[in-house]
Each structure stands twice: as C-alpha cells, then as structure tokens.
Design a protein with these regions (language model features):
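Polytopic transmembrane helical bundles with strong interfacial aromatic enrichment
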Residues: 1-124
Length: 124
C-alpha cells in the first residue's frame, strides 16, 4: 500500500516513540528487579510515563497498520499489548506497598510483550 510522505513521517515518529519508550520501560523494570528494588520509587514516574507513551504509540500504530481481518500476526501483537497493559497496571497498583513484587511481575509480563513484538511478523 503506497503511503504519502506525511503518513511515512507519522509512522516513523510513532515507531520511534513506541520503541524508545518501550526500551526504557522494559529496561528499567529489568534493572530494578536485578538490583533488588533499588531505584523503584525514583523511577516510578518515568516508568509510568514511558508506559503511557509506549501504549498510546502502539495504539496509533495498530490503527494505521492493522486494518482489515485479523490473523496470527495481529493475535500475537494483541497478546503482547495485553501483557504490556497488565504490566503497567501491576506496577501502578503495587508501587507503594510492594514495589519489588510488582516489578518482578511486570518484568515477566514485559518479557512476553517484547517476545511477542519481536516474533509477530513471523508467526503463522
């Protein structure tokens, strides 16, 4: 499908935001877990900001790139997106009472998310 120049720019911006924010979010989550919770309270705000940008950019990308019938690729991306939303919810719900437990759960969910995003194109 041919894209206009302006649509290509929008796609590049959304992809860049999605990937960069997602890398920070997942990377900081894995680092916090590995460090035994060190920095969890300091990074909570930036993590939630990155989660928001990642999810909103992903929604925008889905709306532009995945119109029409759903197939294995879309199902894989949807599983990854669901895990990402769940990870953000867990981090938000646990950041005051038990941040390390929440970060551990979120790390597992984000691992599934990253794998789904990486393999989606090749599924089916």
């Amino acid at each position: 499908m041919p894209w206009s120049d302006s649509m290509q720019v929008v796609l590049m911006i959304l992809i860049g935001l999605h990937i960069l924010a997602g890398v920070f979010w997942a990377g900081s989550t894995f680092t916090i877990v590995r460090s035994g919770g060190t920095g969890a309270s300091t990074l909570f705000g930036p993590q939630m900001g990155a989660a928001t940008v990642t999810i909103l950019a992903g929604v925008g990308l889905w709306g532009i790139l995945h119109r029409g019938p759903e197939g294995p690729m879309e199902h894989t991306l949807a599983l990854g997106a669901l895990c990402a939303v769940a990870a953000a919810g867990v981090q938000g719900a646990t950041h005051k009472k038990n941040p390390l437990k929440g970060q551990r759960i979120a790390a597992a969910l984000l691992l599934v998310t990253v794998v789904c995003m990486a393999i989606a194109r090749y599924v089916g």
